[in-house]
From Swiss-Prot:
Protein name from the UniProt record: Uncharacterized protein RP092
Highest taxon of the lineage: Bacteria
Gene3D superfamilies, sorted: Tetratricopeptide repeat domain, Vaccinia Virus protein VP39
Cross-referenced InterPro entries: SAM-dependent_MTases_sf (IPR029063), TPR-like_helical_dom_sf (IPR011990)
Species for this entry: Rickettsia prowazekii (strain Madrid E)
Amino acid sequence: MLGKIKYIIKHYYLTIINIPHFIKNQILEFRNYINDCKYKFSHLAETNYQLGFDHLYKGNLNDALLRFKLVNKFFNSNDSKVYYQLGLIYYLKNNYRQATVYLEKSNEKYKTIFINFLKNYQFITEIPQEIWAQYRDLIAQYYPTIFNNEKNIHLPYRFVNETLKHISDLSDNYSILELGSNIGLVGYEVQKRFPESFTLTGVEISSFMNEIQATFYQNTKIYNHIYNIAIDEFLKQNSNKFDIILSFCGLSFTNNLIKYFNLIYSCIKKQGYFALCLPNSVKTQFSAKRKEFIFNLNEVNNFLQKNNFTILTSDEIILAENNKYSIIVCKKIT
């Protein structure tokens, strides 16, 4: 009996003296649990942010919106980068008011330029370079689908083929400049169809379009030279003259075409050619839905003639009821 009592006393004594160690271990376990939860939450935030980013660049706007809103609500509230991405999404979804709301909450580099553009887009004559470059970055991966149509008209091919029809007397080793070379849609057709031999130079403001060109055209070198720069900056700095200048929807960031036609004219050799494709409309104006200017064909022709170009052909191509383009080929006679 006495032995049993001693055992019980010893048991409780050991239990009591171990309580501090027990409490300490429990605290450590709880701290580890909290740290683990923090890591997982941080990881979830990063994962959802990256998924949102991927969806945004693939054009899956609703999925991108969901991911960034999850990050904003549950993980990183009031995050400047998240607000900026939400602003971009609403811009692409044509909700300019909501885009402005989120951009105003951000502190990113082009915030002020973007907000000013969104509030005054009805009055602009040119899309700011920073916005145009970012927009083309965002649409780069699905850019070819913009020209999809039920008529199976391959617009880049149509543009190159129409240009080639009206070009003659090319010198050996002639030079071609493409303004707004995108992911290489037109450059690829030029390499396939234009007679050898020539050098092809591309100018594209979107760094991402230049970067993913190799993804679309693997093992194919399209351009001899490519410049990641705004078109007007290139034309002002350029000292070379080209036999042919092409622009496939590369000038739709501006309605001040006279300015650009004048710069282009000075960069073309005598008897050289200028071919362009532009989105068409009854009235020249900025399209909030398309994020670019759309042009009246007669006005464009008049601007070309005022800049001393001789128009060889000027046609409207109808892909769909509200998706029309003009293809114009002209020549510098003097």
